[in-house]
Amino acid sequence: MRIGITCYPTYGGSGAVATELGLELARRGHDVHFISYASPFRLRGFAERVTFHEVTQLEYPLFEQSSPYALALAVKQHEVAKREQLDLMHAHYAIPHAATAWLAKQMLEHEGLGLKIVTTLHGTDITLVGQDPSYYTLTKFSIEQSDAVTAVSAYLRDETYRAFGCGDCEVRVIPNFVSAADYYPPSDDFWRERLAPKGRRVLVHVSNFRPVKRVSDVVKIFASVRKQLPATLVLEGDGTDRDLAEHEVDHLRLRNDVGFLGKVVNV
């Protein structure tokens, strides 16, 4: 098959899963085309049957405060789908990717061409962003207009039905995954001993450090754990709340017990 995949390229679960899925599809003989404003962070180097298409935007004074990225994305999705004869477009994260895929599909149908849309719901696109009044109607419409919809958990599926209704569409649960060939417990304690002294418990938090991830609360909870037993907190990732977490660590006098590793490609 010829498959288009649109995802956010930045550090985060939706982009990571989308990229790993695309790479595995390519290894199985499918042609995969990633479409986004930057190359996904998990897409490193050359991969056979994988092509990246960058979405470029017009720099114009009128758009200084509100660059219409979604429109540029829809145009690029239409362009790639038409030129590469895509069979389907897989939109990861409903806003705006499912909506722009639908717009691209309408342009293709106007030209006598078809395109199937698969939308995967990842979390905050439904529980936070999608339920905001500014996006609610469009999110509901995009889900209902998709040819297939998946969610990464049963909770997210149920929340989609509760918040949006979507009675006419089936949301299938396909949990996130990791490759057991690439991610497996080490055979020794080499890395563990470098993260924490022997005998200490190791707690790990991995995220993009956005407010919804509540990293400062993680630090506060760890402070309670630390009062009960020897432990080390390892924070992997970076984002807007990194400084807030650093401040909380210093405020609770946990600097010797908390490590910030920053962005780590292979966790």
Regions found by a protein language model. Give the residues of each.
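A short, glycine/small-residue-rich beta-strand->loop->alpha-helix junction that serves as a flexible
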Residues: 5-19, 213
